[in-house]
């Protein structure tokens, strides 16, 4: 057994060996992680970038959306660890949870006079918590407390917060008060029962009569993305492509030895090693000639068709990607023509989807158009695409679900807006002659951008050819 002294000495040595940043100087000690292993910079770099994005979003998107949806004052109360889904879209990257109770208040002071929307139209108040890097005006308690270093004041607490909210509303006299309540969208249903009750009791009938479900306001604020975020998202997508191409290669796969679970954990480990996150457990699927069910965690063999569903999370943004690969048999240099034709059918569906997704259209309208055109081309497939951004399955219209191809009531009725991102997720099933007519499913997913101008483009590109895995391994 190691002695306590030796254990302390060893621990000290390990701590000294850790990467160190010189406090307040932005300089990194020589033994820090190489920049090549930090594809998106340091945490400090990312936080500064996210803070700029936050201010830009609140200065640009929020005033326009409040006016568009007729919300004079939007109130967003929440308690620690029971945050509203809009929380991550309105707070600093240095804030991880609400502080005790936090009430965010947004007031369109230009609405009453119908003045043009500008970045200065919306007042932003934080009744509790911090200014979120200077983007909110904060209010503190007037309760006396024992002297604190630096003259620190008491924090707002209990009924005092509700009364301060009431005073703020009475001063501003809004005609419409938006609250986050919805039976349709989880993203716009963030007002808890307890907070609604407490707020209603404090405000009284005069002001609660002006409550209106904000619904589309938080939904579209969460969904709206800046051009600067688009550029960063493209870099994220580039990295995902690099990783899927490496995973689906003989650098990682040894045909006849590697199991699908090995690839799952290769992905998880590689994501972690680069300081990234993910929002779901990756999956790997195998289709094999003459085999209906390859079983759980099969060994990957020559001739297999491989499919992955993977994603990464960086700076509160998420990707969602599905790629396809073929494991070459001995003597093969390419995939069979039938498999390439099957992938081409999925590509044709992607082309249709990109043409049909336009601002102002609902998810259900887009789904119907895509499926009608797909069937006219003789393609057997399904579409189940979704918004992406601050959440993997993001705010906005669903374009089908895998088991609801006739449309998605409610969630499919939301409309596409400019500056929104989607994951175009779909599959085409095609008989393959080289496999004796066996149907092969080509499931693809690529992230795309609806620009501020309403035009669509891939975040990076889409997969036009199968990744090829050499079967001999390395």
List each model region and its residues:
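Bacterial N-terminal signal peptides
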Residues: 10-21
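Active-site neighborhoods and metal-handling regions in enzymes and metal-associated proteins
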Residues: 25-474
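Bacterial N-terminal signal peptides that target proteins for export
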Residues: 1-11
């Amino acid at each position: 057994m190691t002695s306590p002294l030796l254990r302390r000495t060893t621990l000290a040595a390990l701590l000294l060996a850790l990467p160190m940043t010189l406090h307040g100087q932005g300089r990194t000690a020589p033994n820090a992680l190489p920049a090549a292993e930090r594809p998106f910079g340091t945490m400090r770099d990312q936080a500064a970038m996210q803070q700029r994005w936050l201010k830009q979003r609140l200065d640009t998107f929020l005033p326009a959306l409040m006016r568009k949806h007729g919300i004079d004052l939007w109130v967003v109360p929440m308690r620690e660890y029971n945050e509203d889904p809009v929380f991550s879209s309105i707070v600093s990257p240095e804030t991880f949870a609400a502080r005790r109770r936090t009430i965010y208040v947004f007031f369109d002071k230009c609405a009453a006079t119908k003045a043009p929307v500008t970045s200065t139209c919306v007042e932003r108040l934080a009744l509790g918590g911090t200014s979120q890097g200077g983007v909110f005006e904060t209010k503190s308690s007037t309760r006396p407390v024992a002297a604190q270093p630096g003259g620190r004041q008491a924090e707002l607490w209990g009924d005092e917060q509700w009364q301060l909210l009431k005073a703020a509303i009475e001063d501003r006299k809004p005609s419409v008060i938006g609250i986050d309540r919805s039976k349709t969208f989880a993203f716009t249903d963030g007002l808890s029962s307890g907070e609604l009750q407490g707020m209603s009791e404090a405000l009284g009938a005069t002001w609660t009569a002006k409550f209106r479900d904000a619904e589309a306001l938080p939904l579209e604020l969460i969904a709206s993305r800046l051009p600067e975020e688009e550029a960063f998202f493209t870099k994220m997508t580039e990295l995902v492509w690099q990783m899927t191409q490496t995973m689906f290669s003989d650098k990682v796969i040894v045909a006849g030895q590697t199991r699908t679970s090995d690839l799952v954990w290769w992905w998880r480990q590689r994501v972690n090693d680069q300081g990234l996150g993910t929002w779901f457990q990756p999956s790997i699927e195998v289709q094999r000639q003459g085999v209906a069910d390859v079983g759980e965690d099969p060994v990957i063999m020559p001739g297999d068709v491989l499919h992955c569903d993977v994603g990464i999370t960086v700076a509160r943004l998420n990707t969602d990607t599905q790629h396809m690969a073929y494991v070459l048999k001995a003597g093969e240099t390419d995939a069979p023509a039938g498999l390439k034709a099957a992938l081409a059918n999925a590509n044709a569906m992607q082309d249709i989807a990109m043409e049909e997704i336009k601002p102002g259209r609902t998810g259900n309208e887009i789904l119907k158009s895509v499926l009608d055109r797909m069937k006219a081309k003789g393609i057997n497939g399904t579409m189940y695409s979704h918004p992406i951004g601050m959440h993997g399955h993001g705010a906005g219209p669903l374009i089908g679900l895998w088991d609801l191809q006739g449309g998605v009531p409610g969630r499919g009725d939301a409309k596409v807006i400019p500056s929104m991102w989607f994951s175009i997720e779909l599959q085409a099933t095609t008989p393959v002659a080289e496999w004796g007519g066996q149907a092969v499913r080509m499931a693809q997913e690529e992230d795309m951008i609806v620009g501020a101008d309403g035009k669509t483009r891939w975040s990076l590109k889409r997969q036009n050819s199968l990744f090829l895995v050499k079967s001999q391994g390395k």
